[in-house]
Regions:
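Conserved P-loop
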Residues: 2-72
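A generic alpha-to-beta junction signature in SAM-dependent methyltransferases
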Residues: 72-73, 114
Length: 173
């Protein structure tokens, strides 16, 4: 099953995704896309790391997400990807539109063939005002397009607000 868990910053989306991974009763691999480039991000990573069960495997991959999913997906495994918007940020910061398109398309193209459970976590960025800066507008647009394409392919899509899940597609939680 493919699941997409959306929400704003500190909405409870990662905690929900972690609970779903635990509830799957499968072997879990956590795929982290962040690059802790400053102290605050390092603290966030440490917080997430401390909350995860020790038996979960960890793969850190900031760019080649489709490759890691193809290599790691198994029928008896749950892959938890946290998060897609950081992955998108990493690609945007390369300032290589062709690479971004190739990586995004590779991700979307591989999903149907992946066995097991895949849970994606991502920040919902499209509910605010239109950003003033060009790069920020592009980020919000790319995230919105990615979320739409993923939601089409996922069996369950959940929006998390204030720690509460709102199922948008699929079986309610």
């Amino acid at each position: 099953m493919l699941q997409l868990i959306l929400g704003g910053a500190r909405s409870g989306k990662s905690r929900l995704a972690e609970k779903l991974a635990i509830d799957s009763a499968l072997t879990v691999t956590y795929i982290a896309t962040s690059q802790p480039l400053d102290g605050e991000m390092s603290e966030r990573v440490a917080h997430h790391r401390a909350r995860r069960p020790a038996e979960w495997a960890l793969i850190e991959e900031p760019l080649e997400l489709a490759r890691v999913l193809r290599e790691s997906a198994r029928a008896d495994h749950c892959l938890l990807v946290d998060c897609l918007t950081l992955w998108l940020t990493n690609l945007l910061m390369l300032d290589d539109a062709e690479r971004l398109t190739a990586e995004r398309d590779a991700l979307l193209d591989c999903l149907a063939s992946l066995p097991g459970e895949i849970i994606f976590v991502s920040n919902e960025t499209g509910m605010g005002v239109v950003p003033l800066g060009e790069l920020t507008r592009r980020y919000v647009d790319e995230a919105g397009w990615l979320h739409q394409a993923l939601a089409e392919r996922c069996q369950r899509v959940v929006l998390t607000v204030a720690g509460l899940p709102l199922t948008l597609k699929g079986t309610a939680l």
